[in-house]
Regions:
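Glycine-rich phosphate-binding "P-loop"
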Residues: 1-2, 73
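Glycine-rich phosphate-binding loops that contact phosphosugars or nucleotide phosphates
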Residues: 19-149
Length: 149
């Protein structure tokens, strides 16, 4: 788990260890919505990567068979304690996926099964409310650039 790395470094480290073929975005409510712009960006630009976007419970009860060691799961939970998203991280980890989580609370339950954690300042001020979406977009851009060139 690492919260000091930038998106570019995180993706570089992941791509150095595994051949990324599938990116899955997982969350509930507003956090799921905050992941959507990155999913849309990859849908429109990726030619090789498989892209999925699930509510956490959908992921938990109908986990795609394609989730494996070549999958990056990007999860988000504002406070890091949404039970369904915490469970989704555990399931993804059990399937061998690399998990990147976005939250604002250090050592939240969401971070337990995450390989990488990005903390955002959602509660600090109005402008910070876009940080979660922004960080997720940075991850998507880096995935596209480093996986597909």
């Amino acid at each position: 788990m690492n919260s000091t790395m930038e998106a570019k470094e995180i993706i570089k480290e992941i791509v150095g260890k595994t051949e990324v073929k599938h990116v899955v975005f997982v969350g509930c409510g507003a956090s799921k919505a905050d992941l959507y712009p990155a999913k849309y960006f990859l849908d429109q630009n990726a030619k090789q990567l498989r892209i999925s976007h699930y509510t956490a419970n959908e992921f938990n009860f109908a986990t795609p068979t394609s989730v494996d060691e070549n999958t990056v799961v990007i999860s988000a939970s504002l406070g890091g304690a949404t039970p369904e998203t915490v469970e989704a991280n555990a399931i993804a980890k059990d399937k061998g996926a690399t998990v990147i989580s976005l939250t604002r609370i250090v050592d939240a339950p969401l971070t337990k099964d995450a390989d990488y954690v990005i903390y955002h300042g959602f509660a600090e001020n109005y402008a910070a409310k876009l940080e979660k979406t922004g960080y997720c977009l940075l991850l998507a851009v880096e995935l596209l650039n480093q996986v597909e060139g």
